């Protein structure tokens, strides 16, 4: 229930800036690695290549990314963030920071560390 509420609020925060969770994840990944191979990006984000292709089509249509054939490997496609993509990322980053502040209001550092530790253990348990 909490996960749904947090997810819905995060989606709303991004939507207010014209974004979405997939858009944020892609732009944020590209922001930290200015360009990357499309296949590597799909792996990094943990999504199937056809799903990423659909999202990239939309982002490219809006001028936020460009795709180019690799100069060294004709089979590989590089994805690059455009200037408009940088600006969109910055707008969404501002919304993400504000969302995180709102989410963590009234929760101390020790409580957040404890929450992180519990969530890490849950993830480890699921991976078994």
Regions found by a protein language model. Name each.
Residues 1-4, 15-18, 76-78, 92:
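Short amphipathic alpha-helical segments, especially helix-boundary/capping motifs
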Residues 4-51, 62:
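N-terminal helix-turn-helix DNA-binding core of bacterial DNA-binding proteins
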Residues 124-128:
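Short, charged, intrinsically disordered terminal tails
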Residues 35, 39, 57-120:
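Charged, amphipathic alpha-helical coiled-coil/dimerization segments
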């Amino acid at each position: 229930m909490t996960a749904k509420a947090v997810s819905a609020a995060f989606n709303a925060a991004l939507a207010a800036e014209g974004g979405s969770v997939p858009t944020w994840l892609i732009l944020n990944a590209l922001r930290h690695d200015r360009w990357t191979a499309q296949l590597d990006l799909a792996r990094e984000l943990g999504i199937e290549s056809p799903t990423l292709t659909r999202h990239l089509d939309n982002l490219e249509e809006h001028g936020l990314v460009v795709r180019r054939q690799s100069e060294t490997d004709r089979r590989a496609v590089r994805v690059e963030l455009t200037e408009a993509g940088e600006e969109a990322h910055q707008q969404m980053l501002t919304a993400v920071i504000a969302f995180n502040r709102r989410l963590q209001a009234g929760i101390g550092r020790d409580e957040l560390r404890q929450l992180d530790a519990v969530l890490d253990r849950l993830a480890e348990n699921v991976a078994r």
